[in-house]
């Protein structure tokens, strides 16, 4: 009987530890687009509502640490971010986060990243 209780308690503890390690699920209002770059890297563009504005998260994952990328984000054709990012451990990726206005109608968001050394290009689009 004591062994059975201990086994059930251990199974419950393992289930809780696994559930705690899982990433948070995307909100139902989020818009997430993914795609491949011109080389082996992948991109993800996530748009989320944030206090009447739009949170823009643009991620590039090349699986190689230390790469420098030139990054630009646009909203309805207007640049909202320009800068460089370097891929970092553990996954060889970077992320840019910008919060921008949520204007009337559809907001077209475009992300572009170019690897400074190889010229590999990532281009992603999403609408909110």
Residue ranges and their predicted role:
Residues 1-9:
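Bacterial N-terminal signal peptides that target proteins for export
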Residues 15-24:
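C-terminal segment of classical bacterial N-terminal signal peptides
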Residues 23-51, 127:
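Transition segment at domain starts
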Residues 32-33, 78-91, 126-127:
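Solvent-exposed serine/threonine-rich low-complexity stretches and specific carbohydrate-binding patches
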Residues 55-61, 99:
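Short edge beta-strand/loop segments characteristic of extracellular beta-sandwich folds
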Residues 68-78:
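Short, surface-exposed beta-strand/strand-loop-strand elements in extracellular ectodomains
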Residues 91-102, 124-125:
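Exposed aromatic-hydrophobic patches
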Residues 111, 117-128:
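Edge beta-strands of extracellular beta-sandwich domains
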């Amino acid at each position: 009987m004591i062994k059975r209780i201990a086994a059930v308690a251990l199974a419950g503890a393992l289930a809780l530890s696994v559930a705690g390690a899982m990433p948070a699920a995307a909100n139902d209002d989020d818009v997430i687009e993914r795609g491949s770059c011109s080389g082996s890297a992948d991109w993800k563009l996530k748009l989320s509502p944030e206090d009447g504005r739009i949170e823009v998260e643009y991620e590039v994952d090349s699986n190689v640490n230390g790469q420098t990328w030139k990054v630009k984000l646009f909203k309805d054709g207007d640049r909202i971010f320009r800068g460089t990012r370097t891929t970092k451990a553990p996954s060889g990726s970077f992320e840019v986060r910008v919060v921008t206005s949520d204007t009337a109608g559809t907001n077209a968001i475009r992300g572009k990243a170019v690897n400074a050394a190889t010229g590999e290009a990532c281009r992603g689009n999403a609408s909110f």
